[in-house]
Amino acid sequence: MEELKGYLEKSRSKQQHFLYPLLFQEYIFVLAHDHGLNVNGSIFYEPAEISGYDKKFSSLLVKRLITRMYQQNYLINSVNDSNQNRFVGHNKNFDSQMISEGFAVIVEIPFSLRLVSSLEEKKEIQKSQNLRSIHSIFPFFEDKLSHLICVLDILIPYPVHLEILVQILQCWIQDVPSLHLLRFFFHEYNNWSNLITPKKSNYYGFSKENPRLFLFLYNSYVVECESIFVFLRKQSSYLRSTSSGTFLERTHFHEKIEQHLVVLCCNDFQKTLWLFKDPFMHYVRYQGKSILASKGTRFLMKKWKSYFVNFWQCHFHFWSQSCRIHINQFPNFSLHFLGYLSSVPINPSAVKSQMLENSFLIDTVTKKFETLVPIISMIGSLSKAKFCNVSGNPISKPVWADLSDSDIIDRFGRICRNLSHYYSGSSKKQSLYRIKYILRLSCARTLARKHKSTVRAFLQRLGSEFLEEFFTEEEKVLSLILPRISYPLHKLYRERIWYLDIIRINDLVNHL
């Protein structure tokens, strides 16, 4: 990082802001290799079909690549050769992937340095901001949503044209060659005329090919989408909210730099600010879904909906479907967010009061925030993973039948404990018990299939030890959190428990 600071200070003294030359530095590719975000393993492991060696990390490949990039028209020639050396294509050329991941490191540098400088100015680093659990959102819901009326359920639209993403980065990165190289990546990857379209194949393919660059671009786009909230909070005395300094995505070290966002939005939204003065506005986002809750009327939320649509159309120059924003009103609404089905039902109750010889009934209404396991969606996810059929009946998983008995039980038990861990905050545990039952019986069917036996005979042979694999670890965790609980643990399962160490959603939950 110190070397990067020195380079940028030298560049700044010459009135230049060039990041492109960093692509010719070997340590940039080392940083990309150490990042470890590539789901298929690092690209810096030389493929056996290219070198004839086993998959080993080789700095020699990086040096050869840098030497070739110094050659004139290397990139142009690599694109014209469509057989083996295509820069970006279906064959996943080794050199192109190396350059792509190195470029992802380069474009992150200005944001990382800006974050470090901002933390140095504050003279304090709040590590809890980066380690905050996903579950911390639900106590916030419980405290706020029960007092609110309307909710906007928003699916953040995708940018239709790739040039939008380039223009967003252009506000922060003044290096024109780097922006041209970014355009080059987009246009040459599967002939992308659109980066993100209703067809999921291109979007999904690019995210798998280079997750680091993809997440960086997506985060930049989301920051731009959320810039309106920063502006309203800064400019309006009626919108009082505390800034938590939240990082964009937990796998990246970027921060929303609010003062820059205000500059971007100041000219666009000042005239319409008076429409949305609301002291009870709360906004929460995770990935591509966000909610905006308010104590205002349905008419106010219609204004917000219209404003969002116009904002996306005017600021990002693409047509946004209004159906991506739903106006809902408590208590006749259930919110799907972070794998939970949340609602605020009204619970009527009657209290009998007696004063001297007179007695009377007092009807009261209370609101309680409830979080439920979306059992239908979960069964769909379990069905996709081949643990049950679409009706929720457990089936064997033949793919795991070749594993040892301990490995099979360990895999099923780990999934069961992870889901129990994540859904520990559920108000009603019946759906969670059903999921455990599906996984437990699917495990028994898989073991019975392996040993060519019946499920009944196999369960009789295993006895209670089979069940302990699914619950022992969970009981240990609960006993550490609530050591003074004296009543049985089966009563403890009725309580809602929010954990502070969950930083990502389980893969099965992510299918929802």
From Swiss-Prot:
- The reply to whether Nucleotidyltransferase figures as a keyword in the UniProt entry is no
Q: Which UniProt keywords apply?
A: Chloroplast, mRNA processing, Plastid, RNA-binding, tRNA processing
A GO molecular function term, named singly, is:
RNA binding
- Report any one BP term from Gene Ontology: RNA splicing
Under the heading Pfam families, the entry gives:
Intron_maturas2 (PF01348), MatK_N (PF01824)
The main location is plastid
Q: Which InterPro entries match?
A: Domain_X, Maturase_MatK, Maturase_MatK_N
Q: Name one GO cellular component term.
A: chloroplast
**Cellular location of this protein?**
Plastid, Chloroplast
**Which family is this protein grouped under?**
Belongs to the intron maturase 2 family. MatK subfamily.
* Role: Usually encoded in the trnK tRNA gene intron. Probably assists in splicing its own and other chloroplast group II introns.
Protein name listed in UniProt: Maturase K
Q: Which organism is it from?
A: Filarum manserichense
Gene that encodes the chain: matK
